[in-house]
Amino acid sequence: MLRSRPARCWRILHTQRDRLSIRALHSESFVHNPPPWRPVSALDEYVERQIRPISLRQLTFFGRTLTESRLLSSANYVRTELPTRLAHRLRDIQKLPYVVVANPHFSLVYELYYKAFERFRTVPEIRTLDDNDRFCDILRKTLKEHLVVIPRLAMGVLECRGLLPADAMDQFMNTLLRARISRRVIAEQHLALTETFNSPWHFPGSQDRTDLNADFVGEVFLKCNAKEVIERCGKLVQDMIRQSSGSDKIPEISVQGHLDATFPYMLSHLEYIIGELLRNSIQAVSERYQGLQQTPPPIEVLICEAPQHVIMRVSDQGGGIPREILPYLWSFTKGPHSKVRLENLGQVPAMAATLQELSVSSEIKHADKETFRESSLDTLTSRPPDLRLGIGLPMSRVYAEYWAGSLELHSLEGYGVDAFLQISKLGNKNEQVTTRAAIDAV
């Protein structure tokens, strides 16, 4: 089920203005000014509060029967939860050495987070639909402002990699990204519920005010079919690589196993992970067989459905991962190509971490318009598909582990790579806001 046409048109009209404002924030923020002094005690009240995690099942059950009362309850949950989650991450940044916090990229992120914290904690209780509309405007504004966070964090950890142990910096980055996902999930879910409530096909007089057979409840896709997502993402990635490289050695994608496996999930999260795994495999095979006569072997994807999980194995014959890169595969800070990664990240003013933000031709975008669910942020960010940032796999693991899944890679040098993605099938696992390493340390 796609978003209503008026909503899409509204986004198109505002795309150019929003892109300009994001670029302005990106360029102006390189002029680094000392942050204003703030009392540490301002955060104390919210740091002492416990984060209230949610599961996909809770999001689904809450949004199925959407009434005005439930919509306002959702708004007030987001209103109180966002400053709490922001406060915990602000305190984490405050605990870093000053020389790290003074980095202009980290300083910008800190200022954005503190500004959002002050903004949300001063929002009064939401009692009416008009209050909710004003709150949604605040959410959209903040989501747009924070599109610069991922590239800035990535540049910050690369520039500060000699100031803290690499493992500590990676864990810090993982925690901030996981928390960022958590905030965007609850914010975008509420925006989607509000859009559903205000849509013309939503009837106020009915007891159950949403379609029980709808594929989406807010941003939660109830019938996520692994085979369909793989084939859809695979076609988009094949077209992107063919367009960017001009290569005719693009391998086919073979999908086998439990082809009917379905599960509830955030579609944009799964598309990002699958897209990244397929992109790496297709690029490796295409480069290995470029200039050779034989047809490149296919990328083989096996889907296995277990009682509580769905496991996907992506196998390629692209020659494996070079030995000098393998130890740094999941790191945001380490690796032999850190300097190149830093230069490439400087070309990315904003990033939503979705598959759709990769720049492709207008023909491909038009062809996939009705097959990919449109995000409210997709039109605000774009980057060339061949621009290597070095954060795709670490970011994919963050997405996978966020809903209590996992992502592992096994490389056979000289042959290829097997990637294993495990997804919780039942949707009953709470979001993993805290990293496993942090939990173990408690």
Q: Which sequence ranges carry the predicted segments?
A:
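Flexible, glycine-/charge-rich segments associated with ATP-binding catalytic modules
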Residues: S21-Q58, G63-S73, Q94-P97, T128, ...
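Signal-transmission coiled-coils
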Residues: W37-E252, L267, E271
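N-terminal chloroplast transit peptides
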Residues: M1-T15
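Conserved catalytic submotifs in the C-terminal HATPase_c
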Residues: I250-A261
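ATP-lid-like helix-loop hinge signature
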Residues: N280-S315, R341-H366, T371, S375
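Conserved ATP-binding N-box helix of the HATPase_c
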Residues: L236-M240, S244, M266-P297, A306, ...
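Short acidic-aromatic loop segments in the C-terminal HATPase_c
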Residues: W330-K334
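Glycine-rich G1-box
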Residues: G319-G320
